[in-house]
């Protein structure tokens, strides 16, 4: 079975076979891709994904810029503001695709974008999870959200009904330059051409962010049921080992499923967005961890999402977002953990 991260593991850890002595665990490229319960290895990630701000190189160049001009939030804002001001001349509807808060799209902002202030708070405090988020970087969250909804293809009041498909259509229709999403979205945007796709880190105005890379992690971890028979456990371990070491298994995962797997025998992906993600790492940029797997509940995400939507529509204040983020976290953590 699978879990999505530490929060999921907390519910299922009693059923997790210890993988620390398995051949599968020995094939991992980094220990950071394993979830532990004390000394036991309870779960192992089997697919690594990356997200950031996908951009259309052709449109960015037409506006007079390249990726080299964008090294932090201030640069991103300057470029986006300029594109927005010249949108008629450039033939676009906005710098950014619509930040849709319909259920097909809101996860990009209440989860993936919200990861950034959490990541920087954890980093500053030297922690990996918390029962009470402080909201140290919520002013930074505000400025990137303000940029997304201001330099956009649509009026912020319309975001509640804007969908994931709307954003894809705007981006592939060359009506927007920037689109926050991840490596998994390649199939949706491939019509623009591989050479025309670039990816930027999500800058939120934090000191030293010129060294920041893309957001890389996993929400997909294999667990083996310790209540199964020994024969079934061994058969499962043998199969998973075959998946990540054999030519047929690694080909199926890379080519048929489009996965980047965190194992030594992994095949290279043909997805150009994954190539870009790998280049950031090769260039020594610091990847942003996926800390959203420590968010206390789905209810917490929904509270943040509702507050973001109301703020964008002008019916709510930013303070409501802060309350949903900070007070909501403490409340939901307590409900989940007692």
Question: Locations of the language-model features?
Answer:
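Extracytoplasmic/periplasmic solute-binding protein
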Residues: 36, 40-46, 51, 77-130, ...
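Hinge/lid segment of periplasmic solute-binding proteins
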Residues: 1-51, 55, 108, 112, ...
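Short, solvent-exposed loop/beta-turn-alpha elements that line the ligand-binding surface or hinge
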Residues: 17-31, 95-96, 100-103, 118-143, ...
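Short helix-initiation/N-cap motifs at beta->coil->alpha
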Residues: 73-75, 159-173
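Conserved C-terminal helix/tail region of periplasmic/extracytoplasmic solute-binding proteins
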Residues: 61, 85, 250, 267-269, ...
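Extracytoplasmic/periplasmic substrate-recognition and gating elements
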Residues: 39, 63, 191-256
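Glycine-centered hinge/linker elements that transmit conformational signals in sensory
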Residues: 80-81, 126-161
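Alpha-to-beta junction loops
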Residues: 1-2, 90-92, 173-181
């Amino acid at each position: 079975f699978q879990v999505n991260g530490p929060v999921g593991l907390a519910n299922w850890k009693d059923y997790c076979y210890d993988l620390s002595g398995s051949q599968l665990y020995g094939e991992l490229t980094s220990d950071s891709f394993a979830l532990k319960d004390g000394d036991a290895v309870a779960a192992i990630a089997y697919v690594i994904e990356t997200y950031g701000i996908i951009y259309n190189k052709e449109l960015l160049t037409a506006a007079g810029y390249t990726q080299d001009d964008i090294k932090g939030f201030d640069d991103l804002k300057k470029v986006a503001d300029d594109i927005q001001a010249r949108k008629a001349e450039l033939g676009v509807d906005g710098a950014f695709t619509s930040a849709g808060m319909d259920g097909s799209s809101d996860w990009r902002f209440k989860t993936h974008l919200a990861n950034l202030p959490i990541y920087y708070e954890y980093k500053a405090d030297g922690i990996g999870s918390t029962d009470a988020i402080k909201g140290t970087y919520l002013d930074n969250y505000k400025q990137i959200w303000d940029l997304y909804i201001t330099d956009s293809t649509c009026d912020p009041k319309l975001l509640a009904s804007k969908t994931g498909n709307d954003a894809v259509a705007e981006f592939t229709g060359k009506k927007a330059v920037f689109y926050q999403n991840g490596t998994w979205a390649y199939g949706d945007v491939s019509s623009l051409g591989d050479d025309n796709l670039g990816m930027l880190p999500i800058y939120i105005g934090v000191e030293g962010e010129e060294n920041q890379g893309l957001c890389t992690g996993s929400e997909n971890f294999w667990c083996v049921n310790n209540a199964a028979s020994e024969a079934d456990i061994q058969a499962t371990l043998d199969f998973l080992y075959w998946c990540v070491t054999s030519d047929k298994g690694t080909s199926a995962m890379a080519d048929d499923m489009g996965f980047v797997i965190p194992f030594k025998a992994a095949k290279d992906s043909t997805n150009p967005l994954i190539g870009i993600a790998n280049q950031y790492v090769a260039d020594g940029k610091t990847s942003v961890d996926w800390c959203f797997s420590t968010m206390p509940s789905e209810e917490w995400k929904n509270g943040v999402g509702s507050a973001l939507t109301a703020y964008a529509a002008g019916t709510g204040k930013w303070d409501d977002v802060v309350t949903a983020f900070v007070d909501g976290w403490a409340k939901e953590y307590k409900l989940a953990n007692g």
